[in-house]
């Protein structure tokens, strides 16, 4: 995949990338795409998948858990995975 196509993927929102990935999967499952085109869209699908995974990881990293004091009142936040 060329750099221009890769840059196009990085500019997509999560929702846009998932939508395009669903279209690619559908086209590949139908089997009505020529071999060369199948390889091309498969590679784009891989780039879209990686992009979605990166966006999900970034979102997970931003999620915080509300910390409560002994009385149950919010006291602050901490990373979701912190114990």
Swiss-Prot record:
Subunit structure: Heterooligomer composed of large and small subunits.
Entry EC no(s): 3.1.11.6
Subcellular location: Cytoplasm
Gene3D superfamilies (alphabetical): Exonuclease VII, small subunit
Principal EC category: hydrolase
A Gene Ontology BP annotation from the UniProt entry: DNA catabolic process
GO CC list: cytosol; exodeoxyribonuclease VII complex
Name assigned to this protein: Exodeoxyribonuclease 7 small subunit
Catalytic activity: Exonucleolytic cleavage in either 5'- to 3'- or 3'- to 5'-direction to yield nucleoside 5'-phosphates
Stretches assigned to coiled coil: none
Keyword set, alphabetical order: Cytoplasm, Exonuclease, Hydrolase, Nuclease
Top-level taxonomic group: Bacteria
Sequence similarity: Belongs to the XseB family.
Organism: Sinorhizobium medicae (strain WSM419)
Classification via NCBIfam families: PRK00977.1-3, xseB
Function: Bidirectionally degrades single-stranded DNA into large acid-insoluble oligonucleotides, which are then degraded further into small acid-soluble oligonucleotides.
